[in-house]
């Protein structure tokens, strides 16, 4: 089975419902025009999921709708949290889990992330497990150890046959303008695939898509597309502008 290609936009805490609808009114036609090989998705804020779901349906778009996080329980006394059944009301296809901002700002731990990965997979929502090393780990030469641990612990609750997507985002490259070289990214992605083969099997590791994120822009997207183990992109700031995101998508699919 051939690995699928994905280009996802993570909007973080940006865009009101109106702004999201305005974005999609411009971006969806771009996607139809480009007709990319990659599956395209956006992960907006929870408060705009309804508007995005409505717009995607109205425009008969193939764009996937994602969420930026989720609680592992289906309901309960968890103030401020959102459950998988709530996301499924808006036909959410994927959910980002373990993003570095959740790990480092909100102190999410691997064990909790693993529960979320398992819950999402069992609910039919594709978990996108985000992994990445800090600048300190990179400078100390412990990148592979950090990533290996994040993969093994984060995937501990994933059902054996469930789909999963991995997103490698070096923390030192997120929103900093610093971009890892294509050679470095390819080396890390190949290593991650090797770890996945140990966790699951060689066969399963070959069908798991691994995305790259970290200051991805239109002018570097084509370079990442040439890396054999880079199966897509997780785009931050560059996904907030419809033309800019379309350019990333176009260049990655040249």
Curated annotation (Swiss-Prot):
It is found in: Cytoplasm. Its main location: cytoplasm. It is an enzyme of class 5 (isomerase). The keyword Transmembrane does not apply. Belongs to the triosephosphate isomerase family. NCBIfam families: tim. This is Triosephosphate isomerase.
